[in-house]
Design a protein with these regions (language model features):
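Short hydrophobic, aromatic-rich alpha-helical segments embedded in or entering the lipid bilayer
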Residues: 2-18, 192-233
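Signature of the 12-TM Major Facilitator Superfamily
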Residues: 31-32, 107-111, 178
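Transmembrane helix segments
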Residues: 42-50, 166-209
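Transmembrane helix-loop junction
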Residues: 45-49, 89, 98, 133, ...
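Alpha-helix N-cap/start motif
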Residues: 106-107, 140, 172
């Protein structure tokens, strides 16, 4: 009779710690997700004209408009720039295949990556909100429940898209190419380069149907007093379900 070999207690926690150390040593994705968004927030906050309300921006200031956009940017950058790379590299190097011969399943590496990067996202969001409130006089989020729901769905949508890219890309170089082709257009429709409120009708409609556009819209509503639009939540949930299914079907461990 063959004995079943189980992973030692605490093995998953050790994998999470290892992935966290690797993320700290190779912080490019974390810098993109945390550093760039924080730098842009400070830059916008230091421009006095950006703190004056505008009728063209639905009565909000430019700074207030960009806070939720930068939160969406942070989520997208970590999920799309940092998540696929290590997973594709592990597959290229045969690490995932070798783990299948150990008591710890290869899926634990994937789960550990998600834990580390979810923590990085939450840290980034807290930093952006705290800095905006403490140093630039932004009001605290009005609808905390709606904000949490919007953040959870945004993270789920972007994680599943990132995992699908990791599933499709055969090499780390191919993953970077796909990411560049996906991330920057998504950030355009989220309003990073041009405020969504000023987009013409067709582009505005497209924006609301993209994951980061829907995320930014849901965040705007929840931060400034309302519940996120149902359409935005459904769009994010739809991306999570569709790309979650694709990632599961397409992901290869070797």
């Amino acid at each position: 009779m063959t004995a079943t070999v189980t992973a030692p207690r605490g093995a998953f926690g050790q994998i999470v710690r290892n992935e966290a150390r690797l993320a700290w040593r190779q912080p490019a994705g974390l810098i993109a997700g945390v550093g760039i968004s924080l730098g842009l927030l400070i830059m916008f906050g230091e421009v006095s004209a950006f703190r004056q309300s505008s009728a063209r921006l639905d009565g909000l200031t430019t700074f207030e408009i960009y806070l939720p956009i930068l939160i969406a940017f942070s989520i997208g950058a970590i999920a799309l720039i940092y998540l696929p790379g290590p997973l594709v590299s592990y597959r290229e190097q045969g690490i995932l295949r070798r783990m299948s011969t150990t008591p710890a399943p290869a899926s634990w590496v994937l789960a550990a990556q998600l834990v580390v990067q979810a923590c990085a996202m939450v840290f980034s969001l807290l930093v952006l909100l705290i800095v905006s409130i403490v140093f630039f006089g932004a009001s605290a989020p009005k609808n905390v429940g709606g904000l949490i729901l919007a953040i959870v769905l945004s993270i789920a949508a972007m994680f599943t898209i990132g995992l699908t890219i990791a599933a499709m890309a055969r090499t780390a170089g191919a993953a970077r190419g796909i990411l560049a082709a996906v991330f920057y257009p998504l950030m355009f429709f989220a309003g990073l380069y041009y405020p969504v409120q000023l987009m013409p009708g067709i582009m505005l409609g497209i924006s609301h149907l993209t994951p980061l556009g829907a995320s930014a819209q849901a965040l705007v509503y929840s931060i400034y007093g309302g519940f996120p639009p149902v359409q935005s939540l459904l769009v994010l949930a739809g991306y999570s379900l569709i790309f979650g299914y694709l990632a599961r079907r397409l992901f290869r461990w070797e």
